[in-house]
Swiss-Prot record:
Induction: Inhibited by heat shock treatment.
Organs and tissues of expression: Widely expressed but preferentially in the root meristem.
17 X 3 AA repeats of M-G-G: annotated segments: 129-194
Gene: P23-1
The protein's name: Co-chaperone protein p23-1
Protein's organism: Arabidopsis thaliana
Alphabetized UniProt keyword annotations: Chaperone, Cytoplasm, Nucleus, Phosphoprotein, Repeat
Amino acid sequence: MSRHPEVKWAETTEKIFLTVVLADTKDTKVNLDPEGVFDFSAKVGPENHVYELKLELADKVNVEESKINIGERSIFCIIEKAEPERWNKLLRVKKPPHYVKVDWDKWVDEDDEGSAGAADMDMAGMEGMGGMGGMGGMGGMGGMGGMGGMGGMEGMDFSKLMGGMGGMGGMGGLEGLGGMGGMGGMGGMGGMGGMEEFEDSDDEEETAKSGDKKDDAVKEEGLATEKAPAAEETTSVKEDK
């Protein structure tokens, strides 16, 4: 036997905000047709309890512009009205069932629709929402099966995803950090080893200069030795005279 989940709703002139309060759903199916008939079914829990809904909305809707988000705690729908006007009720029936309640947290009075708060509420939960149109052929909303596409993350090949990360070429450029291997170029600081060669060349130059000085000293010494006998010869000549 199926059960009925709690349903909350609010409206603006152009939209209906519909929340099916049901956590951790499986095999979730949603269908919305242009006449405003909303069908929902899902399984919950280890025993796969079945929850179902069939709501005949107060007026026609624009399925293609409507959106849905299947979350962990609830299923949130933004249903676009076919004609922009206040319905003042959710269903065609005079007395709604006990599980259908007004969502006062999202309710916006007609006079307040242009306010920033109303705009924020309109955008709430929009991130990650899929269109209800073309959702798998479930009457316009059948596309909601496409919401399985949301679950499609489960079927995503993460190796390809990571490969795509490689596509963040700049990140691949981190291989350039291998260029940090270029820090090995700091080994080029080994070229600073060239500083040692530079110092050696200085030493050699100084040694060479020192050797030159020694050679000069030896030459001067030789000259002095050569001049000495001449002096002696002069002395002996004088003595002979």
